[in-house]
């Protein structure tokens, strides 16, 4: 069985929920404190043993490439000024993994974005990490899925429970059997209508997929939002070859919409020793 050493991070979206900030700035580069959100995702992949990462980008995304590239002039200035801590942070972001880029030429959905990286992946199993979800966990969320893949040899989809009122916002699984945190899946449903979801186990932006998924994506018809939906292709693959779901452990932060982004920023700031005391005092002064 081939080891999981490659990952895809889709980052071609327009980021319309954060306009006008994302008119010229990639949404993935918006920072949680002093680190862009996409770096948290790359760090998770690297901690999970991923060596090669392909980031699927689009127009106006050059800042992502610049961030993970070395900047010798900046490094020299920091070194000359004795700012060793900042220098270490800057260099760290360039050394996480081997990072490559491919452009999604049309905005045709997540499934289409994954297809854009087919040549990079070849005939290997691979991970997918979506940038809207930062997961804090002792064992990286995607590593938990990799462990299930190495045990079963089958594709694995990361899920977590959500309130029933929110199920229409996610891809949802209809579980068949349960073994601890692992599920066999009867079917996958992309954004079911309110009140029709088969469970409250939602797909949460972490996948380990076998290369056969590309064959299903190639023939996948447009689905929700008139886009090529990855969930729809996974559902078809599941009909031929069992796909598992795994309820991964960890605290998930939704940074794909404004309120979640603000909540995440506040929570991370409260974890920072240099900010906690003053921020706590400020929040109390608001008298909310």
UniProtKB/Swiss-Prot annotation:
Pathway: Glycolipid metabolism; diglucosyl-diacylglycerol biosynthesis. It catalyses: alpha-D-glucose 1-phosphate + UTP + H(+) = UDP-alpha-D-glucose + diphosphate. It is an enzyme of class 2 (transferase). It holds the Pfam family NTP_transferase. One of its GO terms (biological process) is enterobacterial common antigen biosynthetic process. Its EC number is 2.7.7.9. GO terms for molecular function: UTP:glucose-1-phosphate uridylyltransferase activity. CDD domains: UGPase_prokaryotic (cd02541). SUPFAM superfamilies: Nucleotide-diphospho-sugar transferases. It comes from the Bacteria. Keywords: Carbohydrate metabolism, Nucleotidyltransferase, Transferase. PANTHER family: UTP--GLUCOSE-1-PHOSPHATE URIDYLYLTRANSFERASE. Catalyzes the formation of UDP-glucose from glucose-1-phosphate and UTP. This is an intermediate step in the biosynthesis of diglucosyl-diacylglycerol (Glc2-DAG), i.e. the predominant glycolipid found in the S.aureus membrane, which is also used as a membrane anchor for lipoteichoic acid (LTA). Belongs to the UDPGP type 2 family. This is UTP--glucose-1-phosphate uridylyltransferase.
């Amino acid at each position: 069985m081939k080891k999981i050493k490659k990952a895809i991070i889709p980052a071609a979206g327009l980021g319309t929920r954060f306009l006008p900030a994302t008119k010229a700035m990639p949404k993935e580069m918006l920072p949680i404190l002093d680190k862009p959100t996409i770096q948290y995702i790359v760090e998770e992949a690297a901690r999970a043993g991923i060596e090669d990462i392909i980031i699927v980008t689009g127009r106006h995304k050059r800042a992502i490439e610049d961030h993970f590239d070395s900047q010798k002039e900046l490094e020299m200035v920091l070194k000359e000024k004795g700012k060793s801590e900042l220098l270490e942070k800057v260099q760290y972001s360039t050394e996480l993994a081997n990072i490559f880029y491919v452009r999604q030429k049309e905005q045709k959905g997540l499934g289409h974005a994954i297809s854009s990286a087919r040549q990079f992946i070849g005939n290997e199993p691979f991970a997918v990490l979506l940038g809207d979800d930062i997961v804090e966990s002792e064992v990286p969320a995607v590593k938990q899925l990799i462990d299930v893949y190495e045990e079963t040899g089958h594709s694995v989809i990361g899920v977590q429970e959500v309130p029933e009122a929110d199920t229409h916002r996610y891809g949802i699984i209809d579980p068949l059997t349960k073994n601890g945190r692992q599920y066999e899946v009867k079917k996958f449903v992309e954004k079911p209508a309110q009140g029709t979801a088969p469970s409250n186990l939602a797909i949460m932006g972490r996948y380990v997929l076998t290369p056969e998924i590309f064959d299903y994506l190639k023939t996948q018809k447009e689905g929700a939002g008139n886009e090529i939906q990855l969930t729809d292709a996974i559902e078809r693959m599941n009909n031929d070859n069992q796909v598992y779901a795994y309820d991964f452990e960890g605290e998930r932060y939704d940074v794909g919409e404004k309120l979640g982004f603000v909540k995440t920023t506040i929570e991370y700031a409260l974890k920072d020793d240099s900010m906690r005391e003053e921020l706590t005092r400020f929040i109390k002064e608001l008298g909310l």
